[in-house]
């Protein structure tokens, strides 16, 4: 039984991967450009705030591989369980040329300036252009990894200028497994919409990290980065930076599978998952680094370390917006629900860990980001739900997604993934405090920052048009960021996919970025779902409050705010995770996790029905084509038959014309019959005979061919059958004969023996008798 089951599982998995890749490829082209633009805008807005956020975030970065690059500031890449660099990745290589595969810059002081911080990571990873350059799969995977790495450097806040160089990151990317590649692809599209969009680099890399969890993608580099992650222990204000201390926790996440130095990077990741998220945000500001275009590091692939953290459940609980983002990219619910997967993984990995906390950190980071930096980061996270690998989830989010001009919240979503990382998350519970509560009406996102201050951004969600042109794309300040969300349609689907928040991850609420879009309330679903990128109203399900470590819970987000027409799921609050780290701060982060199941203004039903109709239409068309072909064949057969009949009729002495008579038709007038009586038939000339004969021969040949073809087709099987039967009969008969002979021979032998014995007996008797006589 085991063999068949394993085979089926393998086949299903392979088909899933192929399907996801295909869908991503289809979806990328349209969405890519908008996202890039959105990313750039978001990054610009964020860069201002970046410094503070970066500082906060820097504490954790060290452990994660991504962190390698950015030891401290790198938004605690390490925190991300698998190649936490995800978040870091956002800061796309500011300096690195898009063409270059990051890594160019070993080290980036970028920390000092907000923009700079984002850059280092980007450079290290590689220009956003890299994704384009890379083959779809490999390129994506690389892009993701690199991005994640980039994010770290950028995360390294100004204060944490120490962030290490990320030169190592590139190799990681290469190692990404195929699955990661697929996810990365998606990320690439979203994060690095185009080479030119380098700035936008957006850390899809987080998703790649998630992958690492699955595929170790980032591992090679992670090992290199271990040291960095270690030293970056900086803790957020509320959270303990135990970046180095908890290597193990991350590994549970799925980091282990990743080659990354499981312990170091993982530990860092676990401890700094939240931080990583924050850093991610800070990275976002690095819009300019690469092309001078905003890098929109916002990308912040929150999914980052918690490769699985972004699972749909997570998104629901953590990031409403993320969940929105997470559209079923592959149409596969599980996959589409990036959150669920991520959260699942996160939960599994962290179980006891603060699975949710990393998210909170991310949320904080989001808040920390400059206003209007909201960022699609969260959306990106989800995008990769399909991949399922934690890294992937990260990937999904991309800057453009963020609706709110300044929603730090969106970053929070991205961070959500990080939250998945176990222990780090705990530490980062404090990070949770950032309550990215965005009420639909108010669009206010409150997040307590790591420092413990609460940042409230009232987001005027003017992005009524989620589908705005890329130009309007999410300039951070411009709330039109929604533009990037032209994907809106699919978003509806994503929302549907949103699953109940995973109770396991406490962070859900935190990560949950409340994202409100006025009109559509469409959440940007940046899910990897290549085909359908829809922005579903993130607003509806967005509200989630994250409590800062030092602050009391702010249940503000506790009750999900639902925009009109949006259904909200009951919020579930997960108990604060025990602080794995003995962090002094009370990180009773009890992000109230609200799961909102909101159907985009386009009802999910509508989307589904539309898709269903399309499928039906396609099927109908195929059926019609088949029927037409059958009809054509039938017509041809009929034509051939009629021809044959005509030929047969003609061949029976057709048309010899009698003298003076033009018509051979039977309906001749009686008047002409008299003429016919005395008429003598003329033998047709040679030409006529030839034509007639040819017609006869042709018809006969066709008939023969038809029958002979049928017969010839039957001859082989019939002949083989007969031969087989004869052979079997012959074998049986031969066996019978052989047995008979043997039997006869045996009998003969016995008879002879008997006779011989009797003769011997006689001789002996004679001898005895003779002796007696003597």
Curated annotation (Swiss-Prot):
Q: Where in the cell is it found?
A: Membrane
Gene Ontology annotations of biological process type: regulation of inflammatory response; regulation of TORC2 signaling
Which ranges sit in the Extracellular compartment?
28-714
| Transport is among the record's keywords | no
The transmembrane residues are 715-735
Compositional bias of kind Basic and acidic residues: 41-52, 221-233
> Listed GO cellular component terms?
membrane
Q: Where is the composition biased (Acidic residues)?
A: 607-651
Q: How does it sit in the membrane?
A: Single-pass type I membrane protein
Q: Which domain of life does this protein belong to?
A: Eukaryota
> Can you tell me which residues are glycosylated?
57, 189
Q: Where is this region: Disordered?
A: 41-63, 97-135, 221-275, 600-669
List all topological domains (Cytoplasmic).
736-774
* InterPro entries the record matches: ARMH4
Mind listing the GO molecular function terms for this protein?
A: TORC2 complex binding
Q: Where is the composition biased (Polar residues)?
A: 258-275
Modified positions (Phosphoserine) in chain numbering: 769-770
Which residues belong to the signal peptide in this entry?
Answer: 1-27
Q: Which UniProt keywords apply?
A: Glycoprotein, Membrane, Phosphoprotein, Signal, Transmembrane, Transmembrane helix
A Pfam family found in this protein is ARMH4
Tell me the tissue specificity: Expressed in podocytes.
What does this gene product do?
A: May modulate immune response and may play a role in inflammation. Down-modulates STAT3 signaling throught direct interaction with IL6ST, resulting in the inhibition of phosphorylation of STAT3 at 'Tyr-705'. May negatively regulates AKT signaling by modulating the activity of mTORC2 complex through RICTOR interaction.
> What does the record note on quaternary structure?
Interacts with IL6ST; this interaction prevents IL6ST protein homodimerization and bridges ARMH4 with IL6R and STAT3 and therefore inhibits phosphorylation of STAT3 at 'Tyr-705'. Interacts (via cytoplasmic tail) with RICTOR; this interaction bridges ARMH4 to the mTORC2 complex and inhibits the mTORC2 kinase activity.
PANTHER family noted in UniProt: ARMADILLO-LIKE HELICAL DOMAIN-CONTAINING PROTEIN 4 (PTHR21585:SF0), FULL-LENGTH CDNA CLONE CS0DC025YL05 OF NEUROBLASTOMA (PTHR21585)
UniProt name for this protein: Armadillo-like helical domain-containing protein 4
